[in-house]
Amino acid sequence: MAMKEIKITDFEGLQIGNAENAEAATGCTVLLFGKDGAPAGLDVRGGGPASRESELLKPMAAAQIIHAILLSGGSAFGLDAAGGVQKYLEERGIGFDVGVTKVPLVCQSDLFDLTVGRMDVRPDAAMGYAACLGAEHNNYRDGNYGAGTGASVGKMTGMGTCMKSGIGSYAVQLGDLKVGAIVAVNSLGVIYNWRDGHKVAGMLTPDCKHFVDSEDVVFADYEVVENKFVGNTTIGVVLTNAAFQKTQLCKLAGMAHDGYARSIRPVHTSADGDSIYAVSLGKLAADQDVVGALGARVMSEAILRAVQSADAAYGLPCAKDFQ
């Protein structure tokens, strides 16, 4: 059966929007799931996540659907942006009906970009609302946009030897089955091309002319590091038109982390907040393990596209500079 590439927006019941402040080097990306919402799961592997409403996605939680996912910069400060998404959805009568109003269920994960641009400007409710307006036209783009505006990679020795990254996406169709991924790449580790194993972006030598292997730096000294650089976190979403419930989607999110592991080294560290959501947007019957394996593959490709589509900015070089 032939597999073909499709757009990340080629899923029914999905709208994706970006909003950013390019001068301040921060932004957010929203995924809206319509009036009916969508089942979702979450798997967090990093040691330092910044998140909102993540408890909703645990298998024992009562909620079976959510209405939106927001990926954002700003670290924990950026969690304010979800308020704008809630406002947008409430105005349109979207949410969990509690009689007196409808409460939109909005999950959010943030990355750390405070050291790239202006630390005093972070995604807020106004920016979250603007991302929703952008989603009406599916204004999503890969690169230095949305949650990827201030993203960077390879920060083992700090910002002076890291590179610019961004947000990326990739989706495929296999028969009637669709699987896609969107990811903002902001890792401590180096990014590798999952297809051939070559370094694409990451930690550089002091003169910023050559790549350094972050794992070699880690292995060179096993003593406890008190001031490890913590400004990291890769956050992503896997999408499918196959029908799954929350427990199954948590497993799919876990399998998608294989895509992180193929592309980022080291990954899932105590200085990262690596998280992946999985969302079901259809009724198609499909094998969970097949979708999980595809989820890992599209996530790896989305990571690659996130760094390949990024442009040099804020004094940071990009992968295009090393081609």
Regions from the PLM with identified roles:
Residues A2-A76, D80-G83, E91-Q323:
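A structural signal for small-residue-enriched, beta-sheet-centric alpha/beta enzyme cores
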Residues Y88:
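Active-site catalytic microenvironments for nucleophilic, acid-base chemistry
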